[in-house]
UniProtKB/Swiss-Prot annotation:
Protein name in UniProt: L-ornithine N(5)-monooxygenase
Keywords assigned by UniProt, alphabetized: Cell inner membrane, Cell membrane, FAD, Flavoprotein, Membrane, Monooxygenase, NADP, Oxidoreductase
Cofactor: how and how many bound: Binds 1 FAD per subunit.
Name of the coding gene: pvdA
Cofactor: FAD
Disulfide linkage: none
Superkingdom per UniProt: Bacteria
Membrane topology: Peripheral membrane protein
Amino acid sequence: MTQATATAVVHDLIGVGFGPSNIALAIALQERAQAQGALEVLFLDKQGDYRWHGNTLVSQSELQISFLKDLVSLRNPTSPYSFVNYLHKHDRLVDFINLGTFYPCRMEFNDYLRWVASHFQEQSRYGEEVLRIEPMLSAGQVEALRVISRNADGEELVRTTRALVVSPGGTPRIPQVFRALKGDGRVFHHSQYLEHMAKQPCSSGKPMKIAIIGGGQSAAEAFIDLNDSYPSVQADMILRASALKPADDSPFVNEVFAPKFTDLIYSREHAERERLLREYHNTNYSVVDTDLIERIYGVFYRQKVSGIPRHAFRCMTTVERATATAQGIELALRDAGSGELSVETYDAVILATGYERQLHRQLLEPLAEYLGDHEIGRDYRLQTDERCKVAIYAQGFSQASHGLSDTLLSVLPVRAEEISGSLYQHLKPGTAARALHEHALAS
């Protein structure tokens, strides 16, 4: 049995994950501390160092929203943590202006996020995976939480906190038909694209036939990278839709990502929320930037001109079966138009199938009796029953109640400000949690 080490500090807030959402929160808390006093805050992240979608940062990838929607500018344009100041500090501001774009490459935005995160080294711990979160009871009430994590050395650490913010991001969505192939290095999710592609024979120039499952931005980016970076690869795009569909990023539609739209969504009844989410679904899901669609179409057009059919575009196609064989991954493909079933064998399969956001429920399972249906308030605080005195916040898990921007970068600064305000209002100079922790250490 692993020996757990308990720390003596009682934290005011522990954050699970230190991605963009919690970095934005760290900034907001730092600003608020100047007027209201600093809190004892710690963020835990399972990655060994800071990386934002590090395994998907191919050279062609560009940010899909304006750089002005960084970690802070929407609420405090003069912040030293703005993207503009990052460019200034790295002596690239004039060069970036000369690019004439609102959309930096994701590699640069990742470096920006890493740069901001480096200012909060004392408040962050990398290489620590949060295993579980347990209630600490006093007289039948939850006065604090016990956060158990495991570091890279396998050591378990136990910390106490008066409040919690859960923001671990999404987990790869693996279609049912591929789940039996878990662990097979020839089948991998797009979130692990670079790591797995480096291990494939095509990285040394050997021929490969690769399937890309999905019809969204990730699938399109994977296809272009395979076409441009791996001349020995034959890539098949396999998607259920009849075509690659463009993202609607027109100005009026883009207002769905404005902070004020969160109030509109949250104030509506459940049925109306669902209707609005469906109406604007094509702003973010299963859609592709228009310029990328045009590039892909150009690839297939040039194939027709040359008469050399290197790649295939298989729309209206469903994967009914996936089988691992010595020769490769065998896919049974159903053409929705003709009903015909065909079998193709691939050397590798890339699952560009999106993400699920249920990890917060798994982490908070020991608190289930206090959380009810996991309803989230306007301030992103989970609605607990009266026995739970701890404030628990969730970032990136409330699209159904707060709108499509909840999982995106669009509202990070404003959301961080709202959570920090709610947190300071909740935390009062009481000693119940600290006394409870001292009792736990002594027992």
